[in-house]
Amino acid sequence: MYACSKFVSTRSLIRSTSLRSTSQLLSRPLSAVELKRPQMPTDESLSSLAVRRPLTSLIPSRSFQTSAISRDIDTAAKFIGAGAATVGVAGSGAGIGTVFGSLIIGYARNPSLKQQLFSYAILGFALSEAMGLFCLMVAFLILFAM
């Protein structure tokens, strides 16, 4: 941020009585230089400064920090839940592999049951894929609907 600051050289800053204060003002970044003329304090502003405030007003409010922390916790819980639901999609892939692996083993043991084994394999594939899509849908619901 210091590298991005712009240096100021206006007429009001150059009108200084000493050379030293002018060079100090000209070398200060724009964010540190006050370009407006200072306002004279009025009686109302002085009386508001003199009002004593209770000590409880000096304690900073924690509501902003608490809400930011609770939002972070909610976001983390959302990502953890979506990640856990995504693991179900990987389980679907493992289930499909198991179904077709069992089809190959069953066909190798008894080739005469080819049609019945294939029917059961398609049913197992459909159920496993449906569970995977359900898990993916739950993951997207957790991420974008909550």
Curated annotation (Swiss-Prot):
Residues modified as N6,N6,N6-trimethyllysine: 114
TM ranges: 87-107, 122-142
KW Transit peptide (keyword) present: yes
Main localization (coarse): mitochondrion
Membrane topology, as annotated: Multi-pass membrane protein
Organelle targeting peptide span: 1-71
Post-translational modification: Trimethylated by ATPSCKMT at Lys-114. Methylation is required for proper incorporation of the C subunit into the ATP synthase complex and mitochondrial respiration.
PROSITE patterns named among the record's database cross-references: ATPASE_C
Top-level lineage group: Eukaryota
UniProt KW keywords: CF(0), Hydrogen ion transport, Ion transport, Lipid-binding, Membrane, Methylation, Mitochondrion, Transit peptide, Transmembrane, Transmembrane helix, Transport
Localisation: Mitochondrion membrane
One of the record's GO molecular function terms: lipid binding
Pfam families registered for this protein in UniProt: ATP-synt_C
One BP term from GO: proton motive force-driven ATP synthesis
GO CC terms, sorted: mitochondrial membrane; mitochondrion; proton-transporting ATP synthase complex; proton-transporting two-sector ATPase complex, proton-transporting domain
Site-annotated residues for Reversibly protonated during proton transport: 129
Function: Mitochondrial membrane ATP synthase (F(1)F(0) ATP synthase or Complex V) produces ATP from ADP in the presence of a proton gradient across the membrane which is generated by electron transport complexes of the respiratory chain. F-type ATPases consist of two structural domains, F(1) - containing the extramembraneous catalytic core and F(0) - containing the membrane proton channel, linked together by a central stalk and a peripheral stalk. During catalysis, ATP synthesis in the catalytic domain of F(1) is coupled via a rotary mechanism of the central stalk subunits to proton translocation.
Membership in a protein family: Belongs to the ATPase C chain family.
Subunit details: F-type ATPases have 2 components, CF(1) - the catalytic core - and CF(0) - the membrane proton channel. CF(1) has five subunits: alpha(3), beta(3), gamma(1), delta(1), epsilon(1). CF(0) has three main subunits: a, b and c. Interacts with DNAJC30; interaction is direct.
Miscellaneous information on this protein: There are three genes which encode the mitochondrial ATP synthase proteolipid and they specify precursors with different import sequences but identical mature proteins.
Illness association: This protein is the major protein stored in the storage bodies of animals or humans affected with ceroid lipofuscinosis (Batten disease).
PANTHER family in alphabetical order: ATP SYNTHASE F(0) COMPLEX SUBUNIT C2, MITOCHONDRIAL, ATP SYNTHASE LIPID-BINDING PROTEIN, MITOCHONDRIAL
Protein name: ATP synthase F(0) complex subunit C2, mitochondrial
Species this protein is from: Mus musculus
Lineage of producing organism: Eukaryota, Metazoa, Chordata, Craniata, Vertebrata
